[in-house]
Design a protein with these regions (language model features):
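Catalytic cores and adjacent flexible loops of soluble metabolic enzymes
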Residues: 1-143
Length: 143
């Protein structure tokens, strides 16, 4: 819960960085600060990732952002502009936290990520044909 806490418990950027440092001390090398219920806006992303990307520049730091259909691009723009190069995504944006107050909130949609960046940023092993097949399957399941 890197951008707020739906349980009304204490939260701040220093706390996130404190726990990232503790995890780094025991050998964790990859971090994915998470916007578990879609609280982050561009300013919150900037406030968190500006110090994180400086302090943890020797680590792989990504983003697990929950979005609504109208704000995924704003969040992706800000995180990418701050140096984030690894993003969690889900086909059709499915998944998310049941604590989110807005039922439109879900994971970053993989298809929007691909449309935004094109295939140039994807792993060499990524197959657009297999992804298209998975999209068709997801649409047949979820409607």
């Amino acid at each position: 819960m890197a951008f707020g806490n739906p349980y009304d418990e204490a939260y701040d950027v220093d706390m996130v960085m404190h726990w990232m440092e503790k995890l780094a001390q025991v050998g964790v090398r990859h971090f994915m600060p998470s916007d578990t219920v879609g609280l982050a806006d561009e300013r919150a992303i900037e406030v968190l990732y500006t110090p994180v990307m400086k302090e943890f520049d020797q680590y792989e730091v990504g983003a697990h952002l929950h979005t609504a259909p109208y704000n995924w691009r704003l969040k992706l723009d800000m995180a990418y502009d701050l140096g984030v190069r690894r993003f969690d995504c889900a086909i059709l944006g499915y998944g998310g936290c049941p604590m989110a107050k807005d039922e439109l909130i879900g994971n970053m949609p993989t298809e929007q990520f691909i449309n935004y960046f094109g295939t140039r940023v994807l792993s060499k092993s990524f197959s657009i044909e297999k992804f298209a097949s998975a999209m068709r399957g997801a649409k047949s399941i979820f409607g």
